[in-house]
Amino acid sequence: MVHRLIRRQFLPAPIEQVWDYFATPANLNEMTPPDLNFEIIHGGEARMYAGQIIEYRVQFLPGIRSLWLTEIAHVVEGRYFVDEQRLGPYRFWYHEHLFEPDEGGVWMTDRVTYALPFGLLGELTHALWV
């Protein structure tokens, strides 16, 4: 089954500052919840660009680390970018990051379309943890 998660938040900063922060893959360490033990292995050194491959490890369950390889598939400077999983824990992963300047800051919207592996077991896991 394919799932969709949408989150929107207002960031009280200019679009240039917000975009610069999110367009720097090294900042993923700060954005990711600490319990995931997120670690960039390769590809996070340069500013984000279409076609960029980023390899990292994450820990979804205690003691179980997973390799995750994503590609920055689309970028429109200052407006949006999309990362797609190429290898990793999900059966499918498509993550849109949208930025809309507004008075006093920026509305940022995350739209994640994803599917878990393992069929029924994956769906039970989704019901318990997501």
Language model: regions and residue ranges:
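Hydrophobic ligand-binding cavity/cleft-lining segments
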Residues: 1-49
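Short, surface-exposed coil-to-beta transition loops
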Residues: 4-6, 65-69, 91-95
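A general structural-boundary detector
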Residues: 5-6, 15, 41, 59, ...
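Generic structural detector for well-ordered beta-strands
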Residues: 8-12, 39, 57, 71, ...
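Short acidic, gly/pro-rich beta-turn/loop elements at beta-sheet edges
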Residues: 17, 30, 64-66, 93, ...
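Glycine-rich portal/gate segments that line the openings of hydrophobic small-molecule binding cavities
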Residues: 30, 39-87, 103, 107
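Beta-strand/loop substructures that line and gate deep hydrophobic ligand-binding cavities in soluble
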Residues: 82-130
